[in-house]
C-alpha cells in the first residue's frame, strides 16, 4: 500500500492488537485426568495456551498474552490464592518454552499447582483481571477466557452480588469474556445455578446458550475461536463520497475476502547466539563514475516510438495522479443490467463514517434504502487511493445481514463492484461450427460421478491454507530453536479411497465408453489402423480451388517421409490445406502453422 494512503490510525490503533488472558481455576477435579487417554483439564488448558502463544508469535507478534491461575495454595502478588503463571506480555521464545514444559512433563510441574483448601472468591479474581488489563493493556482489544468446572462460585447472596458487579465492570471496560465451562466428574456443568445471570450481564442478552463452550472437547474449539481473531479488521481506505452540488459524506471500505499469504517482514541474522533483525541498505551507483547517486539525479524513462522519454519524480507523480481519492455517483441503472461477468475484482464493502462529516450515516442509509426500493444500482467514478488507477464501479445494496454459509455473513451495506471498460472486454476464439457431440450414455455416467462426488456440507472456513500452515510451522520451529518438521499433513488432498468406493465403477465405465467412441470417430475419419482382415483405409484426395491436390493418402505421406522430403512438401501447403489434412485425421487444428506442421509430422512418424 502506498505511504500516502488515507488510513485513520487513531480509530484503528487497537484494531488487530489483542490482549488475551487465560484465567484457569485450579481444583482437585481440574488436576485429575479425565480418563487414561485424556490428560487433566488443567493440562489441556495450558496446552491450549501454549499452542496459541506459539501461533501468535508468528502471525501476530504485537499481541500480548498472559495466564492467571486461581485456587492455588501459593500466591504471586497481593491477591491471595492467585498465581500469575505468565505475565501479560508479548510471547517470546522463553515464555513459550515455559508453557511447553507443561505439555511434556506435567506431572513434575503440577506440584506447584497444589489447590488450596478454601474456596477462592471469583469477584477477587475478576477484579485482579480488570487491574491487569487497565494497567498493561490499555490500547488493546481485551479478551478474557475463563476456564472452570465450578458451576456454583458464589457461596452466599452477598458474594453473588459482588461477582455480578465485577461482571458489569468488565463490560464497562470493554473486556470481552469468553467462558469455557468444563464438566466436573460427578455431573454436567449447570449454567442455571449462577452463570446464566453472569453471562446475561456480560453479553447483554437473555439467550446465551449458543455463546458458551461446554465440555472438555471445547478447549480445541476455543483455540479455533481465538485463531479467528487474528485476521486484521482495519479499513482498506477512507474517502469522501461525492453526491453532487458540493454534497459529500464520509465512507470507509473493507475487503471481506482476501487471500492470506506468507509475507516476509524482516531479514534475520541467524549466525549469532540469538536471532537478530537485519536492516538491509541499498545504494544506487553510477556505472560510469562509480559514485553514489542522489535522488534528484535519478530519472525514469519509457520507450516510445524508438526513443526514450525521460521523467523526473515530480513529473511522474503528476502523470500517475488523476485526482484525489473519491467516489462520485454519476447515475443509476436497473439491477438487471448488472451481469455476473461484469465483476473484475472482489467486491469492496462500504459503510458510512461519521467522524469527519456529521450526518454521513443518515445520508448513506437513505441511499441504501432508495437503491433497494427502486431495484437499482448506482454507477460511480472511483479512485480508491492516491496514485491508484480510476475505474467505474457498480453500487449494490444488500437487503440485510445474510448468512451465506455458517462461517460467513454478508453484512448490511453497499458493495462496490468494479466494472469492465472497453479495453477489458475480450472476444473468444471462434467456436467450432460442428462440435463433437458426446453419446447420451457417457453424459449420464458423468452425471452419476458428479453427484457421487458432490460435497454438500463443504465450508471453506473450516479448511486452513496448507502452504501457509506449513510456513508457520517452520517459522515456529526456528523461533523456538526446535527441530524443523519433516512430515506435512495436507487435509485438502482428495480422499481417493472414498472416491473409488463411491464412483470408481462409473469411472471405469466412462473410460470404456470414451475408448469405444474414439474408435468410432477414428473409423469415420479414416485414421484407424489396419484391421485384422482389412487393409488400410484409403481416402479420396481433396482438390483445392487452385487445383493443387492435398496429400490425403497415408501411404503417400509415409512415402514422402521415407524419402526425406515430407517437411519440404508440407511446408509449401497453405494453412487451410494443412487444417483439412489434420481435420480428416481427427488431429488438432489449433495453433500457428508451425504447430500444424508438427502435428502432421508426428502423426506420419507413427504410421
Curated annotation (Swiss-Prot):
Every SAP domain range: 570-604
Main location per the UniProt record: nucleus
Superkingdom field: Eukaryota
InterPro entries: Ku70, Ku70/Ku80_beta-barrel_dom, Ku70_bridge/pillars_dom_sf, KU70_core_dom, Ku_C, Ku_N, SAP_dom, SAP_dom_sf
Keywords: ATP-binding, Chromosome, DNA damage, DNA recombination, DNA repair, DNA-binding, Helicase, Hydrolase, Nucleotide-binding, Nucleus, Telomere
Pfam families, per database record: Ku, Ku_C, Ku_N, SAP
Reaction(s) catalysed by this chain's protein: ATP + H2O = ADP + phosphate + H(+)
Compartment(s): Nucleus; Chromosome, Telomere
EC code(s) of this entry: 3.6.4.12
Broad enzyme group: hydrolase
Database matches in PROSITE patterns: SAP
Entry GO MF terms: 3'-5' DNA helicase activity; ATP binding; ATP hydrolysis activity; damaged DNA binding; telomeric DNA binding
Domain Ku: 241-452
Record-level GO cellular component terms: chromosome, subtelomeric region; chromosome, telomeric repeat region; heterochromatin; Ku70:Ku80 complex; nucleus; pericentric heterochromatin; site of double-strand break
Biological process, per Gene Ontology: DNA recombination; double-strand break repair via nonhomologous end joining; replication fork processing; stalled replication fork localization to nuclear periphery; telomere maintenance
Family: Belongs to the ku70 family.
Function: Single-stranded DNA-dependent ATP-dependent helicase. Involved in non-homologous end joining (NHEJ) DNA double strand break repair. DNA-binding is sequence-independent but has a high affinity to nicks in double-stranded DNA and to the ends of duplex DNA. Binds to naturally occurring chromosomal ends, and therefore provides chromosomal end protection. Required also for telomere recombination to repair telomeric ends in the absence of telomerase. ku70, of the ku70/ku80 heterodimer, binds to the stem loop of tlc1, the RNA component of telomerase. Required for mating-type switching.
Binding partners and assembly: Heterodimer of pku70 and pku80.
PANTHER family xref list: KU AUTOANTIGEN DNA HELICASE (PTHR12604), X-RAY REPAIR CROSS-COMPLEMENTING PROTEIN 6 (PTHR12604:SF2)
Listed name of the protein: ATP-dependent DNA helicase II subunit 1
Amino acid at each position: 500500500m502506498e505511504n500516502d494512503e488515507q488510513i485513520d490510525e487513531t480509530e484503528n490503533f487497537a484494531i488487530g492488537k489483542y490482549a488475551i488472558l487465560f484465567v484457569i481455576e485450579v481444583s482437585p477435579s481440574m488436576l485429575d485426568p479425565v480418563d487414561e487417554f485424556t490428560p487433566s483439564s488443567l493440562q489441556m488448558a495450558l496446552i491450549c495456551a501454549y499452542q496459541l502463544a506459539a501461533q501468535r508469535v508468528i502471525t501476530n507478534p504485537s499481541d500480548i498474552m498472559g495466564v492467571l491461575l486461581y485456587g492455588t495454595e501459593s500466591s504471586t502478588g497481593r491477591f491471595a490464592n492467585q498465581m500469575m503463571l505468565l505475565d501479560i506480555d508479548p510471547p517470546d521464545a522463553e515464555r513459550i518454552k515455559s508453557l511447553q514444559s507443561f505439555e511434556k512433563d506435567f506431572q513434575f510441574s503440577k506440584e506447584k499447582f497444589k489447590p488450596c483448601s478454601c474456596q477462592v472468591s471469583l469477584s477477587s479474581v475478576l477484579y485482579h483481571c480488570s487491574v491487569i488489563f487497565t494497567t498493561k493493556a490499555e490500547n488493546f482489544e481485551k479478551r478474557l477466557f475463563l476456564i472452570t468446572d465450578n458451576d456454583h462460585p458464589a457461596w452466599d447472596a452477598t458474594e453473588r452480588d459482588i461477582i455480578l458487579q465485577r461482571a458489569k465492570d468488565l463490560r464497562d471496560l470493554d473486556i470481552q469474556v469468553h467462558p469455557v465451562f468444563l464438566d466436573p466428574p460427578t455431573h454436567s456443568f449447570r449454567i442455571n445455578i449462577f452463570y446464566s445471570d453472569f453471562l446475561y450481564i456480560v453479553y447483554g442478552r437473555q439467550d446465551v446458550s449458543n455463546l458458551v463452550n461446554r465440555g472438555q472437547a471445547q478447549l480445541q474449539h476455543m483455540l479455533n475461536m481465538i485463531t479467528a481473531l487474528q485476521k486484521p479488521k482495519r479499513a482498506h481506505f477512507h474517502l469522501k463520497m461525492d453526491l453532487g452540488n458540493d454534497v459529500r459524506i464520509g465512507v470507509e471500505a473493507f475487503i471481506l475476502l482476501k487471500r492470506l499469504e506468507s509475507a516476509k517482514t524482516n531479514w534475520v541474522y541467524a549466525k549469532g547466539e540469538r536471532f537478530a533483525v537485519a536492516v538491509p541498505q541499498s545504494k544506487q551507483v553510477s556505472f560510469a563514475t562509480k559514485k553514489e547517486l542522489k535522488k534528484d539525479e535519478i530519472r525514469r524513462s519509457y520507450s516510445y516510438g524508438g526513443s526514450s522519454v525521460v521523467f523526473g519524480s515530480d513529473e511522474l507523480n503528476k502523470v500517475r495522479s488523476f485526482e484525489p481519492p473519491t467516489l462520485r455517483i454519476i447515475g443509476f441503472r436497473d439491477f438487471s443490467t448488472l451481469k455476473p461477468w461484469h465483476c473484475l475484482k472482489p467486491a469492496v464493502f462500504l459503510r458510512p463514517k461519521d467522524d469527519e462529516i456529521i450526518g454521513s450515516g443518515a445520508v448513506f442509509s437513505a441511499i441504501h434504502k432508495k437503491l433497494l426500493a427502486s431495484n437499482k444500482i448506482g454507477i460511480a467514478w472511483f479512485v480508491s487511493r492516491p496514485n491508484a488507477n480510476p475505474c467505474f464501479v457498480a453500487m449494490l445494496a444488500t437487503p440485510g445481514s445474510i448468512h451465506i454459509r455458517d462461517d460467513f455473513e454478508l453484512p448490511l451495506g453497499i458493495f462496490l463492484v468494479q466494472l469492465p471498460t472497453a479495453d477489458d472486454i475480450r472476444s473468444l476464439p471462434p467456436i467450432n461450427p460442428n462440435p463433437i457431440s458426446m453419446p447420451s450414455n457417457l453424459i449420464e455416467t458423468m452425471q452419476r460421478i458428479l453427484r457421487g462426488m458432490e460435497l454438500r456440507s463443504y465450508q471453506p472456513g473450516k479448511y486452513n491454507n496448507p502452504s501457509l500452515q506449513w510456513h508457520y510451522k517452520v517459522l515456529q520451529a526456528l523461533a523456538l530453536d526446535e527441530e524443523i518438521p519433516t512430515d506435512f499433513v495436507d487435509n485438502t488432498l482428495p480422499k481417493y479411497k472414498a472416491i473409488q468406493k463411491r464412483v470408481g465403477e462409473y469411472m471405469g465405465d466412462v473410460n470404456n465408453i470414451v475408448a469405444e467412441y474414439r474408435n468410432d470417430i477414428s473409423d469415420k475419419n479414416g485414421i484407424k489402423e489396419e484391421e485384422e482382415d482389412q487393409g488400410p483405409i484409403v481416402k479420396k484426395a481433396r482438390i483445392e480451388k487452385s487445383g493443387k491436390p492435398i496429400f490425403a493418402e497415408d501411404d503417400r505421406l509415409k512415402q514422402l517421409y521415407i524419402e526425406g522430403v515430407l517437411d519440404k512438401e508440407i511446408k509449401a501447403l497453405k494453412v487451410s490445406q494443412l487444417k483439412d489434412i489434420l481435420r480428416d485425421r481427427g488431429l488438432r487444428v489449433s495453433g500457428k502453422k508451425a504447430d500444424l506442421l508438427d502435428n502432421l509430422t508426428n502423426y506420419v512418424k507413427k504410421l
